[in-house]
């Protein structure tokens, strides 16, 4: 529980909060798929509630509903909420922290909410280090209070102010104190390395000296413009309105907008950037945008823009479905080569795309005078159909389930299996205990250890990623196990090793490049 493992190695990329929740839900449900998805689902629902309730308290109940709908239909939010990843959870804790802080700063004094906000930031920190960014909300509030803005107070002179920092330390200590106590008492080098990695390398060093996901400084502007659709389409009308309200010194706009700007600057400074990094700022954008949406949506041009977006989505899916079913274009080939879909799966995928496109076109025609309804219905149909049909079609290709099932059938129930250049899902979805030879260890060294392990007993097989194959393996004897996550996996039987596995410079460079790419993902 304190030190999760990835195979035989300690997992120090992230604190274990997400894994705690998944393990707890597995204890309750006994189903790994449900246990993996529940944290993201509940976190997304919690984020929606925070935004809806806070907007309702700061303005009106109707504004709260606008804020929640804007967030729900933002592409990045919905996409991530349907995946078993850490980002919806950290977004929830940051949003909950913002909720508590704003309840105190704008509607307070409310010391319980103040303490809850800091505690949520602490829980966000032991989920993913950036959870503490929620506390930046105090900075614009303090500046506004000093400059005499109405209806905003930090109440820093009150002794109860320190309940917040204490709550933050208490939440962080839930994980940090026992981890430090156990690691320092063990006096084992792997535990010291774990502390160095998770407390220093994965935080300060990753920020100051990013070694992966290199992107230009303006990268997150493109992410927001493309992945925060449709809410972001209102910005040309919202920005002048925000400017007017800031001139009137309305802190309800200043605090979420200033915090959004601070988060954007924070994530734009390092070279390493990913699209999900900026997602925790999306709820605050929707909060500040919501009071303006009723007026913006009464304008003709914004409504035309939303209707055009719905039509574009429908036409793109219709074109994609027609391409897949007719075999014209590169899409069918990509589904076959990169996703490993069989002909039946490709045909089913084509009909799914056509169904989504037809639904969208029908929504545009039925609600052509109600652009918001047309786009909302189109996006709702897209997510429902894709969730019910698309995930089933792509499950084997987007996870290791298909490859591991095929490998298990091929080698038989009595054989042993070793993994080289593996991902966590390979180990999870294997139908038997599998031998591993390190995760961060270079792939060529993994292969050497795996071949030595294979030679120690009969009926041992290796599952090897294509980029980790070397000249020591007879290409006529290895077998393609399948394709998952756009990668080809090969089974290596005992008689396929025909020479010592000493990687050539070209093989070592190819493996190193592939491993770096995998670690970036």
What are these regions (language model features)?
Residues 38-58, 96:
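Transmembrane-helix motifs of polytopic, lipid-linked glycan transferases
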Residues 1-10, 17-20, 24:
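Extracytosolic helix-loop segments that constitute the early lumenal/periplasmic catalytic or substrate-binding loops
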Residues 51-73:
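Transmembrane-helix signature of polytopic, membrane-embedded enzymes
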Residues 57-58, 62, 97-116, 124, ...:
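Membrane-interface transmembrane helices that cradle and orient dolichyl/undecaprenyl
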Residues 37-40, 79-90:
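Short acidic/glycine- and proline-prone juxtamembrane loop motifs at membrane-interface regions
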Residues 119-120, 132-275, 284, 291, ...:
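Transmembrane-lumen/periplasm boundary regions of multi-pass, lipid-linked membrane glycan transferases
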Residues 50, 90-107, 285-288:
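Specific aromatic-rich, kink-prone transmembrane helix
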Residues 352-359, 370-494, 508-520:
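Short periplasmic/luminal acceptor-recognition loop of GT-C membrane glycosyltransferases, typified by
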């Amino acid at each position: 529980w304190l030190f999760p493992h990835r195979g035989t190695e300690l997992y120090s990329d992230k604190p274990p909060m997400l894994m705690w929740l998944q393990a707890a839900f597995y204890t309750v449900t006994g189903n790994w798929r449900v246990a993996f998805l529940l944290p993201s689902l509940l976190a997304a629902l919690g984020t929606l509630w925070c935004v809806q309730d806070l907007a309702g308290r700061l303005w009106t109940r109707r504004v709260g509903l606008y804020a929640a709908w804007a967030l729900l239909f933002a592409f990045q939010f919905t996409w991530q909420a349907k995946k078993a990843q850490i980002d919806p959870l950290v977004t929830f804790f940051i949003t909950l922290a913002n909720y508590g802080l704003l309840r105190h700063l704008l509607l307070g004094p409310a010391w319980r909410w103040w303490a809850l906000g800091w505690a949520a930031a602490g829980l966000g920190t032991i989920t993913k280090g950036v959870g503490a960014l929620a506390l930046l909300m105090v900075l614009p509030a303090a500046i506004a209070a000093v400059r005499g803005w109405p209806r905003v107070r930090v109440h820093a002179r009150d002794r109860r102010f320190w309940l917040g920092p204490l709550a933050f330390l208490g939440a962080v200590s839930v994980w940090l104190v026992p981890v430090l106590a156990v690691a320092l008492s063990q006096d084992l080098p792997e535990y010291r390395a774990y502390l160095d990695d998770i407390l220093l390398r994965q935080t300060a060093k990753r920020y100051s000296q990013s070694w992966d996901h290199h992107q230009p400084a303006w990268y997150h502007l493109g992410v927001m413009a493309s992945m925060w659709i449709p809410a972001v389409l209102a910005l040309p009308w919202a920005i002048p309105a925000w400017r007017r309200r800031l001139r009137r010194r309305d802190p309800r706009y200043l605090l979420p907008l200033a915090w959004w700007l601070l988060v954007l600057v924070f994530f734009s400074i390092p070279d390493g950037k990913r699209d999900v990094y900026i997602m925790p700022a999306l709820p605050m954008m929707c909060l500040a945008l919501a009071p303006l949406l009723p007026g913006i949506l009464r304008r003709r041009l914004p409504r035309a823009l939303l209707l055009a977006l719905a039509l574009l989505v429908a036409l793109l899916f219709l074109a994609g479905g027609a391409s897949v079913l007719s075999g014209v274009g590169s899409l069918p080939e990509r589904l076959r080569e990169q996703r490993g879909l069989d002909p039946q799966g490709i045909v089913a995928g084509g009909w799914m795309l056509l169904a989504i496109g037809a639904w969208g076109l029908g929504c545009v025609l039925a609600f052509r005078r109600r652009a918001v309804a047309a786009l909302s219905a189109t996006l709702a149909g897209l997510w429902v159909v894709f969730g019910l049909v698309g995930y089933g079609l792509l499950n084997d290709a987007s996870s290791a389930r298909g490859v591991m099932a095929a490998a298990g059938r091929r080698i038989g129930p009595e054989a042993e299996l070793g993994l080289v250049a593996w991902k966590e899902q390979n180990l999870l979805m294997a139908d038997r205990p599998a031998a591993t030879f390190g995760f961060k260890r270079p792939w060529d060294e993994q292969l050497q250890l795996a071949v030595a392990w294979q030679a120690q007993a009969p009926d041992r097989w290796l599952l090897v990623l294509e980029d980790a194959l070397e000249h020591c393996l007879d290409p006529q004897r290895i077998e393609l196990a399948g394709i998952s996550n756009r990668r080809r996996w090969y089974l290596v039987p005992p008689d396929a090793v025909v020479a010592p596995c000493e990687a050539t410079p070209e093989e070592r460079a190819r493996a190193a490049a592939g491993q770096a790419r995998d670690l970036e993902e």
